[in-house]
Design a protein with these regions (language model features):
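PLP-dependent amino-acid enzyme catalytic core
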Residues: 1-475
Length: 475
């Protein structure tokens, strides 16, 4: 399997090359040259693999389709070392939890940091360490987080050989629990940078540093954000696991509702659907920062600046510039790299928007790719949390509540709807308290977390300053 950039760069890169590189040299995002398509008989085989050998073996089978430069026995060992009951607290790794016979939640938050990001990040940490040791190299990971990516990355990379993590986050815009998870880490290879701005400022800094090829190569800069194909690929696996749990036969269709900010999670669903997984709808659920909902409703993709990005009670979705969206647009435009380059590298940079409403591809988006969307507000998510708690005796976090609210708007007869869980409720205790009048249960391992000493550096959203900081700490 070879990989190409959404903006046209194609030098025959293989998986391990793009694992370490992250962003393509032309500023585009890597995708495989083609998506392997699984027919009904292969889906039936994979269902049996999942039911008899578990999640780790399913991950190995699916990753093998995209990874041919890691020996099979090594990839097998990496998958089985990553997806264990001891790491994820459940032998199913990602169990399905029913709310009603037609509506369920895929529990993705059983990992070390209690968020779905662990599902990919734990594998990424093991892949990085494996490949860096094989090459005898080091990697400096530069990332941006709106809350959960940062802690998932840091817990996956802490103590790993040959890896440093420089994680940017919007200063004061994460929940107290999220901040404590990250800033309490004292490992020598972990550096937390609190940026005076919003998540989009952090993400722009990461892209700017990654686009400086000389700096990137001098300081061996890599990324764990979902612009890294390896992370998105790892997320594809749980769509298959969710499908196999929600159905009994390979011809049945399922819809997935995905709380969305950066478009990485639902983009993995897009890849699974392109591979032949029988997905009816991919439901994009946004919060008040509804840039993606606006696009799927109108064809207009209009990013917002920091001043117009709302601070909400589902903060991990407070994003107005969805970095993974470029991958989907590339596919929607029949992989026209020239057009994708024009839209994202030129038009979006100069005008802050583009409009596909009059193009033939937009009229067929739902039919070809299954995408539908909706928006949820603070009032909606509080009511949804209350309703789920009263009616089903379950607590869900505010992002998952956004997913449930929009999922209910897109139910189809005889098609199971699976909502992808974002995090455990304790990560957003204040919102849960407001909604239900009670604090969510605190896992024993995290009881004194928010009282722990913290280590982080505050800086403005200045690319030169972050480069200087990285250079200073990579000596």
């Amino acid at each position: 399997m070879r990989y190409l950039s959404t903006r046209g760069h194609s030098a025959g890169e293989r998986f391990c090359d793009i694992l370490l590189e992250g962003l393509a040299p032309d500023g585009g995002l890597y995708l495989p040259e083609h998506y392997p398509v699984l027919d009904g008989s292969r889906l039936k085989e994979l269902r049996k693999v999942y039911q008899t050998q578990g999640y780790a073996q399913l991950a190995y089978e699916l990753l093998s389709l995209y990874v041919d430069d890691i020996p099979a026995q090594d990839l097998h060992a990496l998958c089985h070392r990553t997806y264990t009951a001891s790491v994820f607290g459940n032998p199913l790794i990602a169990p399905l939890r029913y709310l009603t016979p037609r509506l369920s939640v895929l529990a993705l938050s059983n990992g070390p940091t209690l968020a779905f990001k662990d599902m990919a990040m734990q594998l990424l940490g093991n892949l990085f360490e494996y490949e860096l040791m094989r090459r005898g190299e080091q990697l400096n990971i530069l990332g941006a987080t709106s809350g959960d990516t940062g802690s998932a990355a840091e817990y996956a990379m802490r103590g790993k050989k040959g890896v440093r993590v420089f994680m940017t986050s919007p200063h004061g815009r994460m929940s107290a629990f999220q901040q404590a998870q990250m800033f309490s880490l004292m490992d020598a290879n972990i550096f937390n940078l609190a940026i005076e701005g919003v998540f989009d400022d952090c993400q722009d800094m990461v892209k700017a540093v990654s686009s400086d090829l000389n700096f990137k190569r001098t300081y061996k800069i890599g990324t764990v954000n979902s612009i890294n194909w390896a992370r998105l690929l790892a997320q594809v696996v749980y769509y298959f696991a969710g499908y196999f749990q929600a159905t009994t036969g390979h011809a049945q269709r399922v819809s997935f509702a995905v709380p969305s900010g950066n478009f990485g999670n639902v983009c993995a669903g897009h890849v699974a659907r392109m591979m032949g997984l029988p997905v009816s709808k991919l439901v994009v659920a946004t919060n008040e920062n509804n840039v993606l909902d606006e696009f799927f409703q109108t064809g207009l993709y209009k990013v917002r600046d920091s001043a117009h990005t709302f601070e909400t009670s589902s903060p991990s979705m407070d994003i107005s510039k969805a970095s993974n969206f470029e991958r989907f647009v590339f596919d929607a435009l029949d992989r026209d790299a020239t057009r994708t380059q024009s839209l994202f590298a030129q038009q979006l940079q100069t005008t802050g928007s583009f409009d596909l409403s009059k193009e033939a591809c937009f009229a067929t988006l739902a039919q070809r790719f299954g995408f539908v969307s909706g928006c949820s507000t603070h009032t909606h998510r509080l009511q949804t949390i209350r309703d789920i708690h009263r009616q089903h005796g379950q607590l869900i976090d505010p992002h998952t509540a956004d997913g449930v609210k929009v999922a209910l708007e897109h139910l189809e007869p005889n098609v199971p709807m699976v909502v992808l869980e974002t995090a455990l409720p304790i990560k957003f205790a204040n919102t849960l308290l407001e909604a239900t009048g009670q604090n969510p249960p605190m896992p024993e391992a995290f009881k004194d977390l928010e009282k722990s000493p913290k280590r982080f550096v505050t800086m403005p959203p200045d690319v030169a300053q972050i480069k200087a900081y990285i250079a200073q700490h990579c000596g």
